[in-house]
Amino acid sequence: TGPAEGVQLISPADAEIAEAIAAAPHADEIPLSAANVENVDTRADYLDRAAQLVGESSDVTIALTAMHGVGAALGQELLTRCGFRVSLVPEQAQPDPDFPTVSFPNPEEPGALDLGIRHAEEIGADILIAYDPDADRCAAAVPTASGSWRQLTGDETGALLGDYLARRGATGNFANSLVSSRLLGRIAAHYG
């Protein structure tokens, strides 16, 4: 196996990397130069661009949880800017590294959305969106016709988002990972 082939690190490479990290100075010990440094606030541009993907505003009510992580403020700001009514799950809105309301803070784990679903039911939400603590993944749950809630799989969520964008005439490429469904490819082919 060679470089950049997507394999898990094994011995002895893992130990060599750990040694190199341990030998490196801490980030605050590295001298920095102010020359040629420009601070760029990308938040506003990101929010504007993401809001453009939604287009028209909606009367959808979203229950949102960051599971004690960092995504609550930005997620709420973005979804509100898009015209959605957003209600944070209050018990999980503030970052807390102890994750006191979940046994394991992964929104894809069984039981992790229980508090969010309860909040969604209380406010009459149309959907629950749950971020993982570092906000690089999310899960969604929706009410069913019988009144219960159903957590969508990542493949289902991706397909719904892809279909939504394709129906709106979005251009560009759809991509999926090796472990995700090929349904996005079929959606793209259907819409040309």
Positions of PLM-derived features:
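Proline/glycine-rich low-complexity loops and linkers
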Residues: P12-A13, E19-R43, T144-G192
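General beta-strand structural signal in soluble alpha/beta enzymes
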Residues: L64, L88-P90, I129-Y131, Q151-G154, ...
